[in-house]
Amino acid sequence: MPDHTTFAARHIGPDPQAVAAMLDVIGVGSLDELAAKAVPAGIRDRLSADGIAPGLDRLPPPASETEALAELRGLAEANTVAVSMIGQGYYDTLTPPVLLRNILENPAWYTAYTPYQPEISQGRLEALLNFQTMVADLTGLEIANASMLDEGTAAAEAMTLMHRASRGKSNRLAVDVDVFAQTAAIVATRARPLGIEIVTADLRDGLPDGDFFGVIAQLPGASGAITDWAALVAQAHERGALVALGADLLALTLITPPGEIGADVAFGTTQRFGVPMGFGGPHAGYLAVHANHARQLPGRLVGVSLDADGSPAYRLALQTREQHIRRDKATSNICTAQVLLAVMAAMYASYHGAEGLTAIARRVHGHAEAIAAALGTAVVHDRYFDTVLARVPGRAHEVIAAAKARGINLWRVDDDHVSVACDEATTDEHVAAVLEAFGVAPAEPVASEIATRTSEFLTHPAFTQYRTETAMMRYLRTLADKDIALDRSMIPLGSCTMKLNAAAEMEPITWPEFARQHPFAPASDTPGLRRLIGDLENWLVAITGYDAVSLQPNAGSQGEYAGLLAIHDYHASRGEPHRDICLIPSSAHGTNAASAALAGMRVVVVGCHDNGDVDLDDLRAKVTDHRDRLSTLMITYPSTHGVYEHDIAEICAAVHDAGGQVYVDGANLNALVGLARPGKFGGDVSHLNLHKTFCIPHGGGGPGVGPVAVRSHLAPFLPGHPHAPELPQGHPVSSAPYGSASILPISWAYIRMMGADGLRAASLTAITSANYIARRLDEYFPVLYTGENGMVAHECILDLRPITKATGVTVDDVAKRLADYGFHAPTMSFPVAGTLMVEPTESETLTEVDAFCDAMIAIRGEIDRVGAGEWPVEDNPLRGAPHTAECLVTTDWDHPYSREQAAYPLGKDFRPKVWPPVRRIDGAYGDRNLVCSCPPVEAFA
């Protein structure tokens, strides 16, 4: 175990004495003995004479927090923070300090998880409902989801949504020439394996001949032009096609929104609503539709329902659309998206309100008008919002250089055209410097009136009541107090790795040298960032045993997708494009199957034994049956059942012998770092979750980073980007070349401060805590799966099915009751219905782990009282959970258990009390009566 003065000792919860006590309960004498019993010898890395795991010897020695921050400061200072007037979907913004301090820098917001337990997630669910309302209002459409990964993936999802809605009438999509290049590239990536043909044309001239299922255009366009798309929408509808418009939300405060001209879908980004550019991300994309397409929406959708007392309450709606349930038939492979950034954008809109946003938009447009007036006839377009396209025959390089000399980055379109984008941070001084670069004198602006919007927006009290900093601060505190995040309790969600997000790791993400970088800025502006990215890529290669890494995927789902595309392109490069069969064990997460379907593969399910292991005989039979068409096997390791399968090397060999590739899902890498490397025990490709293993916070449901790591033969097929020729030539999966680059310093700092010994100790401690919980709880809730030596990996599955059969108490009852004890529930009914999957991580102290075990044991005692007939199945502390303060002070308490039993089942001194803000929520009611925007205030009366 690390010395107590190191960062590793601050990150790892149990001290050496606690670890020894846990190992004693498990029945082993040391961490190394535990590793020997849990991790198969055939894949386990052997330590060097210096005690360092192979690969980890390539990491630098651990740094202190002070040293790591000093190194990061040096990398930051190597960057140049120029004035960005590049545009192309990314704009500088002024983040209100009240939002920076109370959301982005607040662990109550950034350490929360996806709101699967809605009763203890009401704060961020309300914030997300505000986001959905904001997007719906601004776009003029009825319903929006709770964020997308970025604008490009939102466009790709818009395409597939329109394709599904058309029910196969056509496989052709029309894309306007003035769509952002990165957006068009991602749409093309998604279209190719799905057999969708893209026709790119200047749609100002109308829809090309032939049948189309959909149309995608931009408002304003990449060139800055504002086009009235009403005629195109009407023409498309006449010919049976749907229309999706990529719309700038700030511009929509002035111009007619997509919904009001008949568009079916709107997509885009909310980045300029207070979220820094961050060298590409993270930012919350958005997707909005008419109500008749609500069930086709991808991703999370927050809806309003009722709780057990009939009060309004928020929850995730229509979850049967999603990948964890529908697998390869899901609407998308997206899990969570960008909740933390969606909250930032929604609160930015609340803070400014409709009037404030409109004033910002008018100021931005005014600066663009000033530039256009001075340029005169050189301006290409008559109608524009923030971006002026100038014709400068043969002078583009000269103008760009002149602006750069004045500290400003412009956008070179080609040798003859330069684009200038204004934003919230643009000043009169910036405008003057731009005019000097063009060599023109200021001129009196001629108003190019673009304000055609007449409809109201953001009229709900959520967008009118919080204009002062005091009001906003208190609103954010009120919302945060309704939730359980890591700042209040462990979150033992299996397969989620809710570990510490250390303050030292988080600090650099708001530094302007990282936060204010445009993703398409000149490379000379970002040497520090590029070195940081290179460091992180090299360290991940060393840790995983692969040969190359791409950091572009901005979610685990996108890492999966990128890895599968690399496999497809590899087979095609060898003259075997017909290889399209993807074998997936029945225990796998639904995202695997959804990603395979998006990559154009056919999913064949491989059975598992009763002990959770892959059925080798069934695997061999499926490999034989599909030998000539076998593309890949997707397998999670350790398995989704929470054990190390001892046959993993044999499984990989069987697939390789048939010409297939092995995709090792890296969701559970926290049980492997420093112990085994997937790139060395048979994997050809893995995605990693930096938001799990490497400490990027979950943010209530995003951001995330899902790098894809590959062996050398797949490296040429890693994601590329139209604006980053230095990357491989694969197909882009994210809008920015390096994805969510501004949060990469978090993982850099974690690895830099932990070092080889600390990383290995983290894995071993996570395994120790999981096995300790398994031992303590097994007699109360049987552990469903263990490995050959009776060990679990970093998580364990508790089987409640026999208990439910005997008593009627369900896994849902136990999950809700845990909130009364002050805990977030483990993962429910995954990967096996009627079970709880518990993952404590290495960061929780023995005191916290014991408190969780004590709560679970007490709950088992309550279950036994139900089973004995002391409490009715329909009226007991579990079925009544969670209990609000309001329900406890009612004068009509007629339950067979006491108020004290409801609120303080282990006494008032057990742990700080968490008061759930609502009772148990009626999910079916919410889906039957779908409401996905802010309800009227009267609903809460």
From Swiss-Prot:
It catalyses: N(6)-[(R)-lipoyl]-L-lysyl-[glycine-cleavage complex H protein] + glycine + H(+) = N(6)-[(R)-S(8)-aminomethyldihydrolipoyl]-L-lysyl-[glycine-cleavage complex H protein] + CO2. It is an enzyme of class 1 (oxidoreductase). Its EC number is 1.4.4.2. One of its GO terms (cellular component) is glycine cleavage complex. InterPro entries: GcvP, GDC-P_C, GDC-P_N, GDC_P, PyrdxlP-dep_Trfase, PyrdxlP-dep_Trfase_major, PyrdxlP-dep_Trfase_small. GO terms for biological process: glycine decarboxylation via glycine cleavage system. Keywords: Oxidoreductase, Pyridoxal phosphate. It comes from the Bacteria. The keyword Oxidoreductase applies. The keyword Coiled coil does not apply. GO terms for molecular function: glycine binding; glycine dehydrogenase (decarboxylating) activity; pyridoxal phosphate binding. The modification N6-(pyridoxal phosphate)lysine is found at residue 692. Its cofactor is pyridoxal 5'-phosphate. The glycine cleavage system is composed of four proteins: P, T, L and H. Belongs to the GcvP family. The glycine cleavage system catalyzes the degradation of glycine. The P protein binds the alpha-amino group of glycine through its pyridoxal phosphate cofactor; CO(2) is released and the remaining methylamine moiety is then transferred to the lipoamide cofactor of the H protein. This is Glycine dehydrogenase (decarboxylating). It comes from Mycobacterium avium (strain 104). The gene is gcvP.
